Amino acid sequence: MEISYGRALWRNFLGQSPDWYKLALIIFLIVNPLVFAVAPFVAGWLLVVEFIFTLAMALKCYPLLPGGLLAIEALLIGMTSPAHVREEIAGNLEVLLLLIFMVAGIYFMKQLLLFVFTRLLLGIRSKMLLSLAFCLAAAFLSAFLDALTVVAVVISVAVGFYGIYHRVASARPDDNDLLDDSHIEQHYREVLEQFRGFLRSLMMHAGVGTALGGVMTMVGEPQNLIIAKAAGWHFGEFFIRMAPVTVPVMVCGLLTCLLVEKYRLFGYGEPLPPTVRKVLQDFDDRSRAQRSRQEQLRLLAQAVIGVWLIVALAFHLAEVGLIGLSVIILATTFSGVTDEHAIGKAFTEALPFTALLTVFFAIVAVIIDQQLFTPVIEFVLQASPHAQLSLFYLFNGLLSSISDNVFVGTVYINEAKTALEHGVISLPQFEMLAVAINTGTNLPSVATPNGQAAFLFLLTSALAPLIRLSYGRMVWMALPYTLVLTLVGLLCVEFTLMPVTNWLLAHGWVTTPTLP
């Protein structure tokens, strides 16, 4: 029997999202104009809370849809103006170009990255050293590349290897249903469960590695570029400015990696079963023997382009997005990718998040127009300059662990910049706050998948159900890293940031720039 038009409309509205979620969004859309008519400030905060809710519920529905509806309504009822949203987008054009071109550029270097992680997985037999290598490799790559892409590559390696062993275990070489374990004997099931534990730990180490490396450079995370632009820092200076906090955090993060593996804590420590290693090694040997000269030259070209990328970023030879565009041109040229549709696939990963980031800027425009964060910032700025650093770090960390860190970082750096322009804080203090904001948004955000886009990407990937990686398990496995990274970051902001930065200034390693 054909359903009614009303029922059909309800089913179409936000698609497969739960009914309670759809109802909640409709209530938000009805309540907001009513509250705005009576108390604009309260309505503004209500909008921010609702938007954070959509980010926290990202697994129910991609936040672009509900967040976009809230932003459109905010524009319609006058909480901000299209002109102000345009100003925010124009001011952050570099970030959008980073997401569009850099992510697409790295897509064409996936073969090289797959090669690197495959060699690590099969070349290192010690689980502790392998975990450390994955964490370090992910950190290094995320300092120059997009964290989402790095995680996507590691996921590709894990899904590929899982599929190889699953087909052997099920005795069905042509079976592509990796979720079906019904044909696997008990012995193989036990080995497969061990293999899942092994892959879970590696994925989490790699995911945390992207956070450790991503906080260190201005291209590591999208919000870093926003903060760097606000502070007037180039690639090298950003790295040096962050070093008093990020270097100790990196060391402690790597030590945490070793400790949880050695003592098998929080679900870590599962080694690669010998039977699985043999199957994977045999497959890799066959693949290497069949690799043509054309494929070998493709890998070499990608390695050279990788060197160009690092050099171009380090010496700031062009804007980040333009460097990404050069990577697309060079990588496609020397990989022989000439078809428009093949090139178009590279942009599918980044564009949904780019659209979501544009919605962020609309919400930021509301925050500025309604002066929502003014009371919070005034409260923080009443504290002593030294205490301000820890308060900014903690406020950022708390919000970033439940919301998207790009959104949080953008809001707080804008508020700090406004305080500087009004003479409330000095330029040196603003620079210290920029470090506290950057580290506060990046480090505690590993607590949940909501804070780190790379974690959310992993949780929603095809790999997660295969290796039994649920939301709760991910939070549990991230817990030791969350505690260590957050506490060490706070201690560094409190005790090492000011003295080390003053030493760097005194010795000419960094200078106080003239802000735009």
Swiss-Prot record:
Key word Cell inner membrane present: yes
Reactions catalysed, as given in the entry: 2 Na(+)(in) + 3 H(+)(out) = 2 Na(+)(out) + 3 H(+)(in)
Cystine connections: none
Pfam families named among the record's database cross-references: NhaB
Keywords of this entry: Antiport, Cell inner membrane, Cell membrane, Ion transport, Membrane, Sodium, Sodium transport, Transmembrane, Transmembrane helix, Transport
Membrane topology value: Multi-pass membrane protein
InterPro entries reported in the protein's UniProt record: Na+/H+_antiporter_NhaB
Molecular function (Gene Ontology), one example: sodium:proton antiporter activity
GO cellular component: plasma membrane
Protein origin, superkingdom: Bacteria
Transmembrane intervals: 23-43, 61-80, 97-117, 120-140, 144-164, 202-222, 238-258, 303-323, 348-368, 391-411, 447-467, 475-495
Subcellular location: Cell inner membrane
Record-stated family: Belongs to the NhaB Na(+)/H(+) (TC 2.A.34) antiporter family.
HAMAP family (UniProt xref): NhaB
Protein name: Na(+)/H(+) antiporter NhaB
Protein's organism: Klebsiella pneumoniae (strain 342)
Gene name of the encoded protein: nhaB
